[in-house]
Design a protein with these regions (language model features):
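BRCT (BRCA1 C-terminal) domain core and associated BRCT-interaction motifs
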Residues: 421, 426-489
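Extended C-terminal subregions enriched in glycine
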Residues: 398-420, 425-433
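C-terminal motif of bacterial Sec signal peptides marking the signal peptidase cleavage site
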Residues: 16-18
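Glycine- and acidic-residue-enriched helix-capping/beta->alpha junction motif
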Residues: 296-382, 419
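Active-site-proximal beta-strand/loop segments in catalytic clefts of secreted hydrolases
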Residues: 276-280, 305-309, 331-344, 402-406, ...
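Flexible, low-complexity junctional segments that flank or bridge functional domains
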Residues: 20-319, 326, 430, 439-446, ...
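Positively charged n-region of N-terminal signal peptides that target proteins for export
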Residues: 1-4
Length: 498
């Protein structure tokens, strides 16, 4: 795909101010190549079977007294004060409760090694406590838990508000601008083509060359990379045929041009309709988003803005997909395999954290149902997708999907399904990378007040070539916070509006 644009595509529109019919054909060639890439990625899925990770729980055993479960839900609205102290006896009680909660309620428990891995981690934490003394600060317990649970590469899993997964951010520079021809990647510097020979000493520069959109709507290349470093800038050395240049790549700031306080909006009067959704956690937002999906699907060219979308329940995602394309991409929700644990303990915990899930509707009725299942139900596992294959959908209408590093969880459920739709182009930066599980369980350890979030589900989907926790999905065109303005310029420049 990255070798499709020639010198004329990158620069003729700049000089002459309008896109020719030939350049429209060039965009179609790029679109065809994008379709081919997405179609090939359908087979790039986890090799594991979801059934290998279904927990084996005693049918009726709760695993806790009701007093213990109640103690885990008393301080859900605040994090622990890490400067306070606990006794070793209190810490041991907390550790015991935590690992039991993981055993009975954590969806990826088997995925991350089951009893063998978690028993080893628990023993290591208890060993640490024995050398901390009779009383110690809570931050020591947190440090021990983070160290020995670091194998939980699940971005939804947090210990006192912090994930164990390193997050990747996009660093880029739009100076200089690059194009590509048969000889390689080049920039026009001082009036001459100058070809890149290496970046940071590596002659394979493909990984650094990011397909993008210029401010006036042209398809171009910029140098960029993903990094887990926390600094706002990083430096690279670009070697040209006639010398070297030091470039400073800046961390892209995503939330520049959209308001996260407006959860949903739809502009049907624009040249190309724009539907923007930042989350579907509230019932009103969720309903509007779903109701408008069928209208969006009828548009010959449309923009779906999922930047900053922090998700919601999978029921909301399923409803939107059903409304948008019931017989097509809706079939691909839940990836290759998906299950959720419905243990008696997890039902109790979920019932007491319902305020976080208002998109599910009548919380009072759901609370009563969950408490009934806790009191009278049995431990079970709901298998919603088993060793399925993703299916490609040859859609004809053009859809641009905007995404950024704040598109996560339920927002990424939509990205996952939309990747199986033809003529769909993803624009922005990498998504946050939070798909493996969810956040259905909130607990606070009774003595230390250390707060945990984790999910009772497990999703197997694309493998690390397409998606990774903490790195997310990658866009087709890498654009910073002004992605909406640039895609509108792209549509105007290449004459893509109906």
């Amino acid at each position: 795909m990255k070798r499709l644009l020639c010198f004329l595509l990158s620069f003729s529109c700049f000089f002459f101010g309008a896109c020719t019919e030939g350049e429209k054909n060039e965009f179609q060639t790029v679109l065809d190549s994008t379709n081919a890439l997405h179609k090939a990625q359908i087979s790039m899925v986890s090799e594991s079977s979801i059934r290998d990770f279904i927990p084996s729980l005693p049918r009726t055993e709760v695993g806790f007294t009701e007093a213990e479960l109640a103690s885990l839900t008393k301080s859900l609205n605040r994090l622990a004060d890490e400067s306070k102290s606990v006794t070793i006896a209190q810490a041991k009680q907390d550790v015991n409760l935590l690992f039991r909660a993981l055993r009975y309620c954590y969806g990826p428990y088997g995925y991350f090694g089951g009893d063998e891995a978690f028993d080893k981690a628990q023993t290591a934490v208890l060993d640490d406590l024995s050398v901390f003394g009779a009383s110690f600060q809570i931050d020591k317990l947190i440090e021990s838990l983070r160290e020995h649970l670091s194998f939980l590469q699940d971005a939804h899993f947090t210990i006192n508000g912090k994930s164990l997964v390193d997050r990747y951010s996009y660093f880029s520079s739009e100076e200089p601008e690059f194009a590509h021809d048969e000889a390689g990647y080049y920039a026009v510097l001082d009036g001459y083509k100058q070809y890149i020979s290496s970046i940071n000493g590596a002659t394979d520069v493909e990984a650094y060359m990011k397909y993008s959109i210029s401010m006036d709507g042209r398809l171009v290349y910029y140098i960029g990379t993903l990094s887990t470093q926390t600094e706002k800038q990083l430096s690279i050395t670009v070697s040209f045929e006639n010398g070297m240049r030091e470039l400073t790549l800046s961390k892209v700031v995503d939330r520049q041009t959209y308001d996260t306080k407006i959860p949903y909006s739809a502009d049907w009067n624009a040249v190309v309709p724009v539907v923007a959704c930042r989350d579907y956690m509230q019932q009103s937002t969720f309903q509007s988003f779903v109701e408008d999906a069928s209208w969006l699907s009828s548009e010959p060219t449309a923009i779906l803005d999922l930047r900053g979308n922090r998700g919601g329940s999978e029921q909301a995602v399923q409803a939107w997909l059903n409304s948008y394309d019931y017989y097509g991409i809706a079939r691909n929700l839940y990836g290759k395999g998906y299950f959720s644990i419905s243990s008696r303990a997890s039902n109790y915990l979920t019932a007491h954290t319902l305020s976080a899930f208002s998109s599910l509707g009548n919380s009072a009725a759901l609370y009563d149902e969950l408490i009934y299942l806790y009191q009278h139900g049995k431990n079970s596992c709901v298998l919603q997708r088993d060793n399925a294959k993703l299916r490609w959908n040859n859609a004809k209408k053009l859809l641009f999907v905007l995404m950024d590093s704040h598109t996560r969880s339920g927002g990424e459920w939509l990205l996952e399904s939309l990747r199986t739709r033809g003529n769909t182009v993803f624009i922005g930066t990498n998504s946050e990378g939070m798909l493996l599980s969810g956040t259905g369980q909130y607990i606070s350890l009774p003595n230390s007040k250390i707060h945990f979030t984790f999910g009772n589900s497990l999703l197997l989907t694309y493998d690390e070539r397409v998606f990774e926790e903490g790195r997310g999905f990658l866009p087709d065109l890498w654009v910073s916070g002004d992605a909406l303005e640039r895609v509108q310029k792209l549509i105007e420049y290449y004459g893509l509006a109906p």
